[in-house]
């Protein structure tokens, strides 16, 4: 008995004394490593203890033991030290990582950082684009990208490797970067497309003609752009290419392309599963705007996208797509976002269907209260429904992505069901510092308090270990839990730190953690801690320590089904006293199938959800089976609209079968065409047509299909129609509106003025209007009241009247950045003020130009000022300015000549900082320059009309054209006609480069003697941007088949017989143009055939289909016209005479049909349609003959045809389209500006609609050799009657040797340069060029002679060797040739050895040519010395020209041959003059 007591006492003593040892062993092992510089990147290689860490000193470190030991990484050459700027790990290959260097040297590891191999690309990795783009199937394929950006314009150079950078090849230059079609391992999975898309690359490249983002194209190549340099365009929209592609993104099995058009903020998202078939994503009428959407973490069967809804409050709407990414359903309103696009959204890791989001509960009050009240919600059914987070009976709210204080995922990890977050109980989320740590071990169903205060946290050992560190100041300990956060233990750190980062392995299976912190809050000195819980020596979990845990529960607490199955995990019980101890082995889910329910189905293609979500409705009329639907009351069996979600594995037997065919009525199908094509509305209270109507053009990337028209009557009543005039409404009834001002850069917006300080705006296409106050009444001066910012739609400058009742009436300018909510005074005593921000002007976002009277006194002269600080300070450009105009990329200023107060000086700036005086051609003799008109300047040159004659009714001048910077001018066309207001009969053809029509006074001398009544006007056309002008060729017969009063045998124009058209100055409305930007090649006009233009009463209507080369009559008399559906329908109506009939053509004017649009005759004042001419609706404005009341008639042609034309974008014709090439009438080929363009034109017989919102160049076919048409006369030279350029009479020949003085190293100079310069747009190579004779620079005769001479021995061999070789070959052939010279042999077959010596053999033909050439060589000997150096210099020059002319390689794609190629837009004329006048349309008289 005593011995038993002794044994018991001994055991107790042993346990007592051994307890401290056991406690000591229970502590985690903690090691620290000091660093001088902050670690800012840390990442594990998956399924390993290997970590990469990058410090701010650009040193890369690695650890192979979970952070316990560190070593700096270097390559064999020792060049990695302090040169690594970023590190990226391969997303799908766990062995690979990439270190990108700062000096063109980069590194790759393929063995988890053990070894590093260098590769060289002599450029820095891209910053604004992804530097590395990975292939989803083959980890050896990577695209490396660099970028150079000026503002929003970037040049991206891409390189590619297919063998882990053992070899690197250039891919191409682009505007938005390149990506693999297979961007994710799940893309095209199971579609058997491996051979087709394995090497496919997609690139966002510049437009063929405009290097602006709205013209970007998405092209692809399957051979790395080796065979076809530009690639093929991707057909994104209904089988057609789309302009404005911004970027692409790989999202699981989806590939997404984002598109944005000019003139709208709205973006279109196009989605594909195979790169072949693309669909536009439908967000149920919700707008997706640029920089206002975020593609979130998505599933294998749907995408999650959050769309910004309120810029000021930063809230959004969460959408979830169907399985093909085309139709999106709204899940959550008012999601919380930040200004970087981050969204408070996270899917619980490895568990299907559970989502945590934060929303803003006080979103309605955010305009007055900027403090968001954020609440947290959770969904257990993939976002269909949401519920609050709860701690007991209290609501819990957690900080999420927008305020996350650690790396990696916010709430969850692969540890099944264990979720944590920092937050608080209550009605909304508090500041981070006021929150506590909470934990859930049932995937968010229930929560409990874990620790007081905010913490960083991580999960280990599949959730068996949770580690946390306080995030509230300096710490000296860590917290950890082994029971899902119920109880917490503490471990001390060796050094106190401010924690920066806590991390562990990505799969959360390890028991090792890494903590990074700084010694001080300022970041001076750093420690990296390795914390290993493996030292706790707990037992390994066994079978009884696990539970079968259901991942999701329904409202009844039962396991819930999602995608046709229930999901379970074998999970360690929270109170189990064991560790998993299975490093790098991920928890495996267990699935149990369910019977199919409605939740397992989605709407099929071409079906959309009903508003209640219970059925799928046809998105387009159904096509019934053959023989069905003879009557509307018939029925047929057709698709239900449902389909089983792809990837859903529910059990159909015993479940719902929603996708079986159902009985449908024939009312759901295509019906018979509508016969009621016209809709008339008479406005009872309107007696006069004011002419004020405006369309809100819908851009290609805009959703919806309304065609909105705004109209103002003479009685100041404002009307709106959203269906192109079929129905009208008065949204501001009773309010008198004096002006409608559409936003020039944002086609969904407009402003309405009342004449006082109340005004209205709309930004949603006139569906809603908001009132606002302008700071002062509108200006009384002749200038615009509004100026709009090109990039920021809410930035406005208002110019208003001040002190007009006190004798000092003047204008002040105010600015707003929030669409009139707040105004700030900009400048007093102003003239015109404008934003001058342009994409081609770096750092011009805040640049504003203003005219201001000196010393704020209107009696003083005007100054032109600029400021980029909203006039906190400013710069005076001109002290005595008359007016200024902004045209495309140029700012053109007219200032008073200090030597002649009645004369003007023109100055030009491209950058808005430096101005240069315009040098007018010396052959334009205008001693007193009283006025000049700025014409269209969209082709990188300024066109000016310089007034020379001001005789009333016979005003004229010279059209002069500048070089690319707008400073040096040459005469393009003399005696161009203008009117007394300064407007010019000049119009550029839309859609085609370099084509313009102008009217000239052909008998100026007679007019000066006899007066304006004697003037004769002729019409001329240019096809090379003003380089050459010619008369319009006359048609042979009139519209009735009769002869004209004159004719030409060859059909060409002559001085006695040509076609003449009434031009710009005779139009009622400046918007009525000859041509259309979408109806490529078409022009219409009213005029006559003869030796000059006659009155309008004698005019007929003519048309061209080939850009003005040939013309045909279409109707006798004057008609007004409009184009529709990109030219596939043309409507004309008689001008100024009563009618009830209009005429229309569906074949580009070959035939015409009549349509009766009214039962009574009407006098039509205007015929209008969308400015893009892409609508099938037309609107007639006028009045009934016996009434003075305004009436409108809508005519809708859409019912005439049903199908859309089918396009084949492979360079071939299709059934509906052919490729059309513009041409020059003086050239045999189709070269214009040095290249051949190809456009898709609808075949005349094709019975379909274009339905294409934007004109599209198919390709630039090829570059051409240069001809005379690629050159124009240089400064001081003028064109001659034979087309040559000659020095202006009386001017001395330019001293070409001045180049020798400017460059002392020059050896020679061009002694004779015949006055030509290349047209800026041309891309031609080689061919014709002006002859140049070079002479030696003074004192460089010896060098010149040495450069161009040939040595005696060289000359000898150059002559003798070819003759000797030719003679020997000739003798050999002569002795063996079957024919001999002069012999003819008939009927003999030639074969074997003799065939080599037959007459057709190259061996015979070539020596004979050489022998024949001997005589020529001998005759050419005297010229040999001259020709040798000339040919070599010509070769060098040609090579140089080719280098700089190479098209479409970088910035401008179409015009990369010029370094100053910039974004351009078409602008109307602006007149610069001394006298004030009345502005009309969009032109401005200065």
UniProtKB/Swiss-Prot annotation:
Q: Name one cellular component (GO) term.
A: membrane
The region annotated as signal peptide is 1-23
Record SMART domains: VPS10
Q: Where in the cell is it found?
A: Golgi apparatus, trans-Golgi network membrane; Prevacuolar compartment membrane
Q: Which InterPro entries match?
A: Sortilin_C (IPR031777), Sortilin_N (IPR031778), VPS10 (IPR006581), VPS10-sortilin (IPR050310), WD40/YVTN_repeat-like_dom_sf (IPR015943)
Pfam families (UniProt xref): Sortilin-Vps10, Sortilin_C
Coarsely, its chief localization is: Golgi
Which terms are listed as keywords in the entry? Glycoprotein, Golgi apparatus, Membrane, Protein transport, Receptor, Repeat, Signal, Transmembrane, Transmembrane helix, Transport
Membrane topology type, per the record?
A: Multi-pass membrane protein
The residue ranges crossing the membrane are 1350-1370, 1406-1426
Cytoplasmic compartment ranges equal: 1371-1405
Superkingdom classification of source: Eukaryota
Spans of the BNR repeats are 61-71, 378-387, 438-448, 480-489, 719-729, 1102-1112, 1144-1153
* SUPFAM superfamilies in alphabetical order: Oligoxyloglucan reducing end-specific cellobiohydrolase (SSF110296)
Q: List glycan-bearing residues.
A: 300, 324, 965, 1263
Q: Which residues lie on this side of the membrane: Lumenal?
A: 24-1349, 1427-1486
Its Gene Ontology biological processes? Answer: Golgi to endosome transport; Golgi to vacuole transport; protein targeting to vacuole
Protein transport recorded as keyword: yes
Function recorded in the entry: Functions as a sorting receptor in the Golgi compartment required for the intracellular sorting and delivery of soluble vacuolar proteins, like carboxypeptidase Y (CPY) and proteinase A. Executes multiple rounds of sorting by cycling between the late Golgi and a prevacuolar endosome-like compartment.
Family to which the UniProt record says this protein belongs? Belongs to the VPS10-related sortilin family.
Protein name per Swiss-Prot or TrEMBL: Vacuolar protein sorting/targeting protein 10
Write the gene name: vps10
């Amino acid at each position: 008995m005593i011995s038993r007591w002794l044994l018991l006492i001994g055991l107790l003593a042993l346990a007592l004394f051994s307890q401290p040892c056991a406690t000591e062993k229970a502590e985690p092992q903690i090691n620290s490593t000091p660093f001088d510089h902050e670690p800012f990147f840390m990442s594990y290689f998956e399924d390993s203890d290997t970590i990469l860490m990058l410090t701010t000193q650009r040193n890369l470190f690695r650890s192979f033991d979970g952070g316990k030991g560190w070593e700096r990484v270097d390559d064999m050459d020792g060049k990695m030290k302090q040169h690594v700027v970023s590190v990226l790990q391969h997303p799908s290959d766990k062995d690979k990582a990439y270190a990108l260097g700062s000096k063109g040297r980069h590194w790759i590891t393929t063995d988890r950082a053990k070894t590093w191999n260098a590769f060289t690309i002599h450029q820095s990795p891209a910053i604004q684009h992804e530097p590395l783009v990975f292939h989803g199937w083959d980890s050896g394929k990577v695209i490396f990208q660099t970028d150079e950006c000026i503002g929003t314009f970037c040049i991206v150079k891409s390189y590619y490797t297919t063998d882990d950078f053992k070899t690197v090849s250039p891919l191409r230059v682009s505007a938005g970067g390149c990506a693999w079609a297979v961007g994710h391992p799940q893309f095209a999975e199971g579609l058997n497309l491996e051979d087709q898309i394995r090497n496919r690359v997609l690139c966002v490249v510049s437009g063929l003609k405009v290097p602006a983002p709205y013209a970007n194209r998405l092209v692809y190549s399957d051979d790395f752009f080796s065979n076809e340099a530009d690639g093929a365009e991707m057909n994104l929209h209904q089988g057609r290419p789309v302009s404005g592609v911004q970027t692409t993104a790989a999202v699981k099995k989806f590939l997404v392309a984002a598109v944005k058009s000019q003139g709208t903020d709205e973006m279109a998202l196009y989605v594909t599963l195979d790169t072949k078939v693309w669909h536009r994503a439908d967000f149920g009428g919700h707008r997706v705007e640029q920089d206002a959407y975020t593609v979130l973490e998505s599933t294998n069967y749907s995408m999650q996208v959050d769309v910004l809804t309120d810029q000021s409050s930063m809230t959004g709407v969460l959408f979830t797509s169907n399985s093909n990414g085309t139709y999106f359903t709204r899940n959550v309103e008012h999601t919380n976002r930040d200004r970087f696009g981050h969204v408070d959204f996270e899917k619980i890791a490895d568990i299907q269907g559970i989502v945590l989001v934060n929303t803003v509960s006080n979103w309605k009050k955010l305009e007055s209260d900027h403090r968001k009240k954020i609440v947290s919600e959770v969904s257990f059914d993939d976002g269909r429904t949401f519920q609050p987070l709860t701690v007991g009976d209290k609501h819990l709210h957690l900080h999420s992505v927008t305020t996350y204080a650690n790396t990696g995922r916010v709430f969850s990890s692969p540890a099944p069901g264990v979720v944590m977050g920092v937050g608080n109980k209550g009605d909304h989320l508090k500041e981070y510092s006021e929150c506590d740590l909470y934990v859930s071990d049932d995937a968010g169903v229930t929560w409990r308090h874990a620790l007081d205060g905010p913490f960083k946290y991580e999960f280990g050992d599949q959730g068996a270990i949770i580690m946390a560190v306080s995030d509230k100041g300096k710490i000296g300990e860590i917290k950890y839990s082994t029971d899902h956060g119920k109880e917490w233990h503490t471990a001390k750190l060796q050094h106190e730190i401010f924690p920066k980062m806590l991390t562990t392995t990505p799969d959360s299976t390890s028991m090792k953690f890494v903590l990074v912190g700084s010694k001080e809050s300022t970041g001076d000195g750093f420690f990296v801690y390795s914390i290993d819980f493996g030292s706790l020596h707990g037992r390994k979990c066994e079978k009884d320590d696990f539970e079968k845990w259901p991942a999701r529960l329904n409202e009844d607490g039962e396991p819930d089904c999602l995608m046709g199955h229930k999901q379970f995990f074998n999970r360690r019980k929270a109170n189990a006293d064991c560790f998993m101890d299975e490093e790098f082995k991920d928890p495996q889910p267990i699935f149990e199938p369910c019977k199919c329910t409605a939740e397992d189905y989605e709407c099929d293609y071409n079906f959309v959800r009903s508003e209640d979500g219970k059925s799928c409705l046809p998105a387009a009329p159904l096509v019934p089976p053959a023989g069905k639907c003879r009557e509307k009351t018939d029925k047929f069996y057709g698709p239900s609209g449902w389909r089983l979600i792809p990837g859903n594995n529910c059990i159909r037997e015993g479940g719902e079968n929603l996708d079986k065919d159902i009985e449908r009525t024939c009312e759901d199908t295509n019906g018979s065409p509508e016969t009621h094509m016209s809709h008339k509305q008479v406005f009872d209270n309107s007696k006069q047509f004011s002419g004020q109507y405006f369309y809100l053009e819908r851009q290609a990337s805009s959703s919806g299909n309304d065609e909105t028209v705004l109209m103002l009557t003479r009685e100041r009543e404002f009307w709106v129609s959203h269906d192109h005039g079929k129905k009208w409404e008065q949204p501001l009834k009773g309010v008198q509106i004096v002006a409608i001002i559409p936003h020039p850069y944002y086609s969904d917006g407009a402003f309405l003025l009342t004449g006082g300080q109340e005004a209205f705006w709309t930004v949603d296409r006139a569906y809603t209007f908001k009132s606002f106050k302008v700071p002062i009444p509108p200006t009384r001066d002749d200038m615009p009241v509004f100026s709009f910012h090109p990039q920021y739609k809410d930035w406005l400058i208002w110019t208003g009247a001040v002190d007009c009742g006190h004798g000092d009436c003047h204008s002040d300018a105010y600015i707003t950045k929030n669409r009139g909510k707040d105004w700030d005074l900009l400048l007093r005593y102003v003239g015109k003020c404008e934003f001058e921000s342009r994409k081609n002007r770096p750092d011009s976002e805040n640049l504003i130009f203003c005219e201001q009277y000196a010393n704020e006194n209107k009696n003083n002269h005007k100054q032109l000022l600029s400021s980029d600080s909203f006039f906190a300070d400013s710069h005076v450009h001109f002290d005595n300015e008359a007016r200024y105009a902004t045209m495309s990329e140029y700012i053109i200023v007219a200032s008073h000549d200090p030597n002649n107060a009645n004369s003007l000086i023109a100055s030009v700036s491209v950058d808005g900082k430096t101005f240069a005086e315009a040098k007018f051609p010396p052959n334009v003799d205008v001693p007193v320059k009283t006025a000049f008109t700025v014409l269209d300047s969209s082709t990188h040159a300024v066109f000016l009309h310089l007034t020379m004659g001001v005789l009333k009714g016979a005003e004229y001048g010279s059209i002069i054209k500048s070089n690319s910077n707008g400073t040096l001018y040459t005469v393009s066309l003399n005696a161009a006609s203008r009117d007394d207001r300064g407007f010019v009969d000049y119009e550029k053809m839309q859609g085609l480069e370099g084509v313009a029509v102008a009217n000239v006074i052909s008998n100026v001398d007679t007019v000066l003697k006899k007066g304006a009544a004697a003037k004769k006007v002729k019409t001329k056309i240019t096809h090379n941007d003003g380089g050459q002008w010619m008369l319009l060729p006359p048609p042979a017969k009139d519209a009735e088949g009769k002869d004209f009063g004159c004719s030409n045998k060859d059909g060409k124009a002559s001085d006695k017989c040509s076609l003449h058209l009434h031009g710009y100055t005779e139009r009622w409305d400046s918007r009525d143009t000859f041509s259309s930007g979408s109806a490529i090649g078409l022009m219409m006009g009213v005029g006559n055939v003869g030796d000059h233009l006659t009155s309008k009463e004698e005019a007929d209507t003519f048309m061209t289909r080939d850009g003005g080369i040939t013309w045909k009559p279409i109707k006798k008399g004057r008609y007004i016209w409009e184009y529709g559906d990109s030219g596939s329908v043309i409507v004309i109506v008689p001008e100024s005479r009563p009618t009830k009939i209009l005429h229309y053509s569906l074949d580009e004017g070959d035939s015409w049909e009549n349509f009766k649009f009214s039962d009574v005759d009407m006098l039509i004042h205007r015929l209008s349609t969308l400015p893009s001419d892409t609508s099938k609706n037309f609107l007639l404005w006028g009045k009934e003959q016996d009434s003075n009341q305004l009436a409108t008639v809508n005519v809708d042609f859409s019912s005439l045809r049903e199908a859309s034309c089918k396009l084949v974008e492979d360079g071939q014709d299709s059934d509906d389209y052919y490729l059309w090439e513009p041409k020059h009438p003086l050239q045999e080929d189709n070269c214009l500006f040095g290249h051949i363009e190809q456009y898709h034109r609808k075949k005349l017989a094709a019975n379909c609609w274009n339905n294409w919102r934007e004109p599209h160049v198919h390709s630039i076919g090829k570059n051409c050799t240069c001809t005379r048409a690629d050159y124009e006369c240089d400064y001081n030279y003028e064109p001659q009657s034979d087309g040559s350029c000659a020095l202006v009479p009386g001017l001395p020949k330019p001293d070409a040797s001045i180049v020798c003085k400017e460059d002392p190293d020059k050896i020679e100079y061009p002694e004779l340069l015949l006055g030509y310069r290349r047209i800026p747009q041309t891309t031609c190579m080689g061919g014709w060029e002006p002859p140049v004779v070079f002479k030696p620079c003074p004192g460089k005769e010896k060098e010149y002679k040495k450069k161009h001479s040939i040595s005696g021995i060289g000359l000898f061999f150059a002559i003798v060797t070819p003759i000797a070789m030719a003679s020997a070959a000739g003798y050999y052939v002569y002795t063996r040739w079957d024919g001999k010279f002069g012999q003819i042999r008939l009927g003999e077959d030639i074969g074997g050895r003799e065939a080599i010596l037959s007459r057709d053999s190259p061996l015979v033909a070539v020596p004979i040519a050489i022998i024949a050439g001997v005589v020529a060589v001998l005759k050419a000997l005297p010229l040999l010395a001259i020709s040798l150096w000339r040919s070599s210099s010509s070769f060098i020059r040609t090579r140089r020209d080719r280098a700089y002319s190479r098209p479409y390689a970088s910035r401008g794609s179409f015009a990369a041959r010029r370094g100053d190629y910039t974004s351009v837009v078409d602008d109307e004329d602006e007149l610069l003059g001394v006298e004030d006048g009345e502005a009309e349309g969009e032109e401005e008289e200065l």
